[in-house]
């Protein structure tokens, strides 16, 4: 079968150029990029009768358009200056796609296939696609899609037509992106409260959200728990279809037998975004949103590694040490070193909230603040004149000012509880200052506003 024969047998929606990366399967392939949902042609003179029968059976199979294949709207994630990830849930074995264009009409789009090589990451529940080759600080329009897979002959696989989502849009990070971001934390699978946050940040036009830990309520014992929390959260359909999510884990995100399967649902950063030394640090981030550099650090569990709750298989102290070396290197990058504003994200606070507060280094109870991380990271943040750390964990909004020996202030976001309220922490550069507004999304009010001058 020639390439020309294969292309002539393909429906129009599968014939265009397909652009994919080494991890995002990006190459311009004319016609042969995706298996045809229509006929496979082969000259009769080259075929034995049994082989002809197999091809006839393959060609005769007509896969109806699979209704209900897409389970919810796509979820944008792992934003980078030149790439954007998207994951979405499906109801049957399928291959995933995304098309992206620089115009709302979606003319001349680039098409990408589900991440993976040599096999695309087909799945019967979660599909993940990475759009690469993008420009920093640029608005794009995209749609996500899936093709159901059938097996008419043994392992021969035939896809249905692609079922597409609605067209959505996003902004890539970069120095010319809007100087605007948001942070939510400690949602703990309370989807009603989460819906108030997601509604608010969409109303405000926040172009990027950091989900700063403790997304589950308790143990995560199966992958479907992650699917519910991230891809199909009740009352929150479309919450990240136009607003990319940057995930920064909290202590609850490490609990349960499925905790290490998060990567099957939420994508990690490309290996090219970090050095070989830091290959295990696949969720740390350092990106620019306009004048603001955003840096993500993972404080891990709220108990020491030798605590019996960790079962002897955790290694959070070495993990924090590795992040310390990574953090130092981020300030050698010009786009981070030259940023007028730098905001770091941690789940567990880095400031001792009151004398004798549990520092996370003892067996009793659980950490209120993370002394080990504060000792490792705090001096680096101060040395580089970072203005702000955003945290969660305590479920109570709190503001601690900078001091003569500590350059950074700390804002703790609120979380669910009988005597607390959920917050959306919004950061935006206005009139030459970084203005942080803390929204009480339960009451619809602003409970705090804090202003920061550019770094000297």
Where are these regions (language model features)?
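N-terminal secretory signal peptides
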Residues: 1-23, 37, 50
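Extended active-site neighborhood of metal-dependent phosphoesterases/phosphodiesterases
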Residues: 131, 139-169, 224-337, 364-368, ...
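Short S/T/G- and acidic-enriched coil/turn segments that sit immediately N-terminal to beta-strands
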Residues: 124-130
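N-terminal active-site segment of His-dependent metallophosphoesterases
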Residues: 67-72, 78-85, 90-97, 105-123, ...
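N-terminal twin-arginine translocation
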Residues: 21-27, 36-62
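Active-site neighborhood of phospho(di)ester-bond hydrolases with catalytic His/Asp-centered motifs
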Residues: 183-185, 209-214, 245-251, 344-346, ...
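Short acidic, glycine-rich surface-loop motifs adjacent to enzyme active sites
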Residues: 334-355
